[in-house]
Amino acid sequence: QQLLEDIARTKSALDRAYSNFENVIDPDLIDSSIYELQSIQMRYRFLLRQASLLEESS
């Protein structure tokens, strides 16, 4: 249950990060948005792998 909540929260954060990236103009903020997106994407992939492993072991 906790894992599913983490996945949902991370997906929401990823959606917000994409929205922020599309709206920034300043080059420094663009770089910052890219790093944020990459970080959240890595966490999202990690959580999805964990869910997959948990499902396989059930």
Feature map (PLM): residue ranges:
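Charge-rich amphipathic alpha-helical interaction elements
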Residues: 1-58
